[in-house]
Structure formats: C-alpha cells, structure tokens
C-alpha cells in the first residue's frame, strides 16, 4: 500500500513537472522568437515555435496512422456475443424524420438481445409525438411506454415522497422487465435523461451504449465497440466514428463534416493509441456498466464554481472513466451519422457550449494526468494553450507587423491547413478532405473568439444548442465575433495608415503583389472545387442517407 502511494506521488510530481516544463518551453520559444530560416526584411521566416507545432502535427498523424493499422488487424479478432448490452437514447424536441431514421437504424443493429431505452426530456403534449414514433417503429406489442410526471430528482405537482418513490420503482421495474422502453419525463436537461436510463438499468447489463435521437447507427456499430471492450478489461469506454448526416444541407454543415473526420480519425485516433480519448461522443459511445455505477451520483451532481453543471455531460462521463485509471478508446470500425447545425448562429452556439465544457473539463482532467500516458499531459498542454498563443500572434502581427507580415500569416494559415488536409485526403482516400483548409478560416474568424467568450462566461449555462424544433433567436454568440472583427479591422487600418507614411520599396511591392495573387488564386481554386464537387454531390440529399453509414 505504501509503495503504491509512493509511486503515485512520484507520478504526480513527474507529470506536473513535465506539463509545466512543456508549457514554459513553448512559451520561451514563442517569446524569444528564434528563427531557423529568415529572409531579408523578414519576408519569410521559420522559427522554433513554428517547428514545435509542425512536429506536433507530424507526431499526431503518425500515431493516428498506427492506431488505424491496429483497428484493421482487430477485424479478424473473434468475440463471443454473450454480454448483455443496453442502448440508451436521449431525445429532446427531435425532428420527426431524424428520430424515425434513428429508430430504424436501431432495429437493424446486429448485436443480439439488445435492450433499447429512449428517455424523452419533456412530458408535455408537445413532446408526445416522439413517444408515438417510438411505438410506431419499435411496435406497440413489443415495447413499454410511460409518461412520468416527474424524474428521479424532481417531484411532480402535488406529489408526496411516497408516491415519488413508487413512481421511481415503477420506472425501474418497467425498464428491467421489457426489451424496448420509452419514458417521457419532467424536463431537466440531457444529464437527467441519461441518469434515468443508467439508474433504472442498475447493474442488470454488462455494457451501456449511449446515442442521441438524431443519430443513425451502422448495423455493426455495437458489435465493434463490444469487441474493443472485450479485448482489454482495462478499457472502460469506447467511442466510434461520428460522421455528418446532413453534410450537404449548407456550407457550415459541409465544413463540419470534414472537421468531424479530422477530429475523430486523426486526433482521437492518436489519443486512442495511448488509451486516453478525451471525449467519447454522445452519438456513439459504450461504457462498462460496472464503472458507471461507481460514479453515477458524482457525475450527475457535478458542480463548477458553485453551480451545478448542465452541459458537457459526455465529456465529463469520459473524464470519470479516466479518473478511475481505466483507458478510453476509439474505433473507426464503429460508425454512425448524426445531425449538425446548418445555420451559422446555431453552430456558433453549439461550439461555444462545447468550448465551455472543454475548458472546464480540462481542469478536472488535469487531476488524473498521472494515471495515464504522458501523451495525455502533452496534448492537454498543446491544445489547451494553443488558442492563447494564436490570439497573441494575430494581434501582434495586425498591430506591430507590416502589410506583408499579415499577408504571410494568412498564406501560412492556409498552407498549414492544406498540408494537414492533404494527409487526411491520403488517409481517407477522398479528395473532399482538401476542404479542411477551408475550415481554418472558420476557426480563425469564429471559433477563436468563441473560445475566449466561452472562458469568460464559463459558469453561465443559460444558452446553448436548442432543440431542432426551436428557432434560434439568441444572438449573444455574435458579440465575441463582432469584437474580434473590430480588433482585426482596427489593426489592418492602423497598419495601412502607418505604411502610407513610408513608400514601399520595389521588393516590397513585388512581395505584396505575388502574395496577394497567390492568396486570391488559392481561394478561386478552392471555391471552384466546392461549387463543382460539393454542389454536385448535394443532389444526393434526397436519397435515404442512413445507407451511407457504411460508405
């Protein structure tokens, strides 16, 4: 016991020193600004900080590639399908078409004897259509439904403690006694919905799969995740490859689709190589049920700065698994399609909410760095502090740099995006990934200020992604974007005013002309490809897209 405690202390000290040293090293490289290569007048330069970021991308891509090779080899691994699995679907104001597609895909799952529990966040007449769809798809004779006036933590009107306790027992018994169950309960957010499913199931099953009501599951998705959990008893949770169902509905959903592929098949695949996936996504994940019941109450009652957390449910669930010392994995062999916002404002609200949960969970996650591979510490430092370095770089360039410095920065952003997207195109075998370089502009213009706004309002839970039947009318997410563009525009105007006081030399004029032409040509080429390739593919929107999961 004393030996284990001593080793634990050493690991805490080691990971802390490693993380602090890494952050100080990167900060020093950024502040000193040592340049490996530079031309006269600093038309072009490549420094130590840039080399660190480039090395990170190379290492990340390498381990992602190695993890994908391991996934392919696991195809031949035989498993016994004798473990009990329950699928928990969280539903809230869902679009009828998406919900039907979700439930139809659930019926096609190949894992035998799977229990299905759909919990609806809301018990009003306006929510009843979701229960009716459940009955229609799953069959009236083979499912049990219940409209609950309350939930596990809130009483209904005029209800006593005794009747509340009886209703909880009724819900639990119904879940245990039936294979397909749909429950409508008093509204209290997604975490309440998930808690109901987990609590009612108890320890009656081996594995619990989670799913959102806008998700279309691949028939083999459950089998593939069970395979990962069966291969290693120290794996506590596993996530699958989440792709976009409505990717051709708008430019924002299309860019989200290429970003999703990168996030799962590069970033999470790399994390999976070291057994420390930071977030098992809500549309497609599976956990050991025995672990869930070790922390279900702490997970539900999570607080931050004195307030109970109402978002980031899936990320915190993953963090709870990591806190016990269990590994979390990703498998590209388990796939699903899910809906993503098609409107800019809804997307921005979603990203801000996700950024809030990321930074909040980053702090919680840091408590368990010592229980996992050093890569977990390394990546947390790199990705956690990168936005701050980037903002400092942009402001410095726009207010202290020259015109060609700003132009060079814009070209560099696109070049890095193009290199990363080219590797993704080769790995995926699909040229569509080249549009990932498009996403870099969206990141710089919208995600970066949204992240800063998320930190400033991290304890505010009053807005986020709304139900799909709700029109987004909250424009507060545009505030940081407006401030950010004002800062950038001010920098450009200031730089131009300063440059007019000193005539450009011939070499400066050439650099500006060539750079501007290259940048313009790049965008013309990319936009032409988008119109010719993506708009043509958009005609497939009317096809039954649940069949595209295997693509």
UniProtKB/Swiss-Prot annotation:
The chain crosses the membrane at residues 12-32, 46-66, 375-395, 403-423, 430-450, 471-491, 510-530. Keywords: Cell membrane, Endoplasmic reticulum, Glycosyltransferase, Golgi apparatus, Lysosome, Membrane, Transferase, Transmembrane, Transmembrane helix. Residues 33-45, 396-402, 451-470, 531-551 are extracellular. Its cofactor is Mg(2+). Its main location: membrane. Its EC number is 2.4.1.212. Pathway: Glycan biosynthesis; hyaluronan biosynthesis. InterPro entries: Glyco_trans_2-like (IPR001173), Nucleotide-diphossugar_trans (IPR029044). It is a multi-pass membrane protein. GO terms for molecular function: hyaluronan synthase activity. One of its GO terms (biological process) is vasculogenesis. GO terms for cellular component: endoplasmic reticulum membrane; extracellular vesicle; Golgi apparatus; Golgi membrane; lysosome; plasma membrane. It is found in: Cell membrane; Endoplasmic reticulum membrane; Vesicle; Golgi apparatus membrane. Residues 1-11, 67-374, 424-429, 492-509 are cytoplasmic. The keyword Chloroplast does not apply. Pfam families: Chitin_synth_2 (PF03142), Glycos_transf_2 (PF00535). It catalyses: [hyaluronan](n) + UDP-N-acetyl-alpha-D-glucosamine = N-acetyl-beta-D-glucosaminyl-(1->4)-[hyaluronan](n) + UDP + H(+); N-acetyl-beta-D-glucosaminyl-(1->4)-[hyaluronan](n) + UDP-alpha-D-glucuronate = [hyaluronan](n+1) + UDP + H(+). The keyword RNA-binding does not apply. Belongs to the NodC/HAS family. Catalyzes the addition of GlcNAc or GlcUA monosaccharides to the nascent hyaluronan polymer. Therefore, it is essential to hyaluronan synthesis a major component of most extracellular matrices that has a structural role in tissues architectures and regulates cell adhesion, migration and differentiation. This is one of three isoenzymes responsible for cellular hyaluronan synthesis and it is particularly responsible for the synthesis of high molecular mass hyaluronan. Homodimer; dimerization promotes enzymatic activity. This is Hyaluronan synthase 2. It comes from Xenopus laevis (African clawed frog). The gene is has2.
